[in-house]
């Protein structure tokens, strides 16, 4: 069907989002704003600007999660980095961007998104990396996601070294179609795309390698999710809860 037409996009065209909930919002209010406004608006207001894939996950309210771990994560693929930056010439994109302040802590870039660089063995805090240097389609593929906290027995520098070693092993030994990671001083976020060719019912994964260097962690399997509405339809919104994870499905713009 047209909504799942495969399009390969470069791994450096993804924005890696780590969002922290506004303290004034309760968990129910946070999830409500994500489900009624933010997640659907990301899709409906960004398709015409060149959005290629959008995979959000909700961590707020998960048992054991510490405040230094993001409350929401997402990867947003674009046709290219240039396409993303050109989007700000559009009123719809500028309007959508303003909605962040009603949901997330934006001061001092606590909540932020960044483009990745190719992983070459070392990590820097808040600089995402991609492990597989070839294009892939993350909307039509099977995605796994893990978010984890730094062990309390480690300082941030040691944590960074341990995670870099784990990512190096994944890059060298695990046959994936894509892998993206970002480390903060207190957390790691990581996504991987399973091989597209049919084969084993248990595709290769790097998740256990990373889980061994994490303290608290949670694995997500984003569910393919369609939005059967337009911007001007009457609609109550999505059901977003703590632990929700979506691989949003949509028809890309025609010239993508």
Go through each PLM region and give its residues.
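Macromolecular interaction modules
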Residues: 1-256
């Amino acid at each position: 069907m047209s909504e799942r037409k495969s399009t390969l996009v470069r791994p450096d065209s993804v924005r890696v989002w780590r969002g922290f909930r506004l303290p004034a919002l309760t968990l129910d209010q946070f999830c409500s704003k994500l489900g009624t406004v933010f997640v659907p608006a990301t899709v409906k207001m960004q398709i015409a600007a060149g959005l290629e894939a959008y995979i959000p996950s909700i961590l707020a309210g998960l048992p054991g999660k510490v405040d230094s771990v993001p409350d929401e994560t997402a990867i947003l693929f674009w046709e290219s980095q240039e396409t993303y930056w050109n989007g700000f010439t559009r009123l719809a994109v500028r309007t959508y961007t303003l909605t962040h302040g009603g949901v997330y802590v934006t001061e001092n870039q606590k909540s932020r998104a960044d483009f990745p660089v190719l992983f070459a063995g070392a990590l820097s805090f808040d600089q995402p990396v991609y492990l597989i240097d070839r294009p892939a389609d993350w909307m039509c593929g099977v995605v796994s996601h893990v978010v984890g906290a730094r062990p309390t027995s480690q300082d941030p520098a040691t944590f960074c070294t341990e995670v870099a070693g784990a990512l190096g092993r994944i890059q060298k030994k695990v046959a994936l179609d894509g892998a993206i990671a970002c480390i903060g001083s207190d957390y790691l976020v990581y996504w991987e795309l399973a091989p597209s060719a049919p084969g084993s019912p248990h595709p290769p994964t790097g998740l256990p390698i990373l889980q061994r260097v994490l303290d608290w962690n949670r694995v997500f399997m984003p569910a393919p999710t369609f939005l059967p509405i337009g911007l001007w339809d009457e609609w109550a919104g999505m059901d977003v809860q703590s632990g929700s994870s979506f691989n949003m499905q949509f028809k890309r713009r025609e010239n993508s």
